[in-house]
Amino acid sequence: SSTKNADKQRDPEMHQTRKGQQWYFGMKLHIGVDSRSGLAHSAVVTPANVHDKHPIPQLLHGAEQRVYGDSAYASQKDLIQAKAPGAKDFTNQRSRKGGHIDEAVRAKNRTKSRVRARVEHPFRILKCVFGFRKVCYRGIAKNLNRLQVSFALVNLYMKRRTLIRYATA
């Protein structure tokens, strides 16, 4: 975050974190996406230093039939069951200590990851079509508002052919 402001301060609501040897400052965007339609139904913004498992309750709306997630969500099965009682949990299994995982589990994780890849499509449209690169505002609330409006437009963009077909019929 820039310090080119009157206070010469970084945004106090955003924090820094490290991934490998690289340091990042800012916020993280977590989205919930319908696995069939690919449309984003929820978006949560957290500071960069918050673990990915914490916004799970805000990402689930309760009517899910299946929940997909990476191995960071593997320890959150109870939380997922409490928030979405009718949903089957399809989170990836973690590898054992030493990194060994049998081929059957690896094949299941690969199949789950193919479905999970649909979560990345709204991010691609947000970045490539709408040109989202950096945050514009100080504070998480303003940036969340901008991102929610952007994801509403992303959903319209993703279903534009269907909408045009119904409008001309």
Where do the protein language model's features map onto the residues?
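Polybasic low-complexity intrinsically disordered regions
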Residues: S1-K88, N92, Q148-V154, T162
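A short, flexible helix-boundary coil/loop motif
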Residues: L163-A169
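Helix-centered, glycine/charged polyanion-binding patches within enzymatic domains
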Residues: Q65-R66, S71-N145
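Short, charged/polar low-complexity linear motifs in solvent-exposed/disordered segments
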Residues: Q58-H61, K142-L144, T168
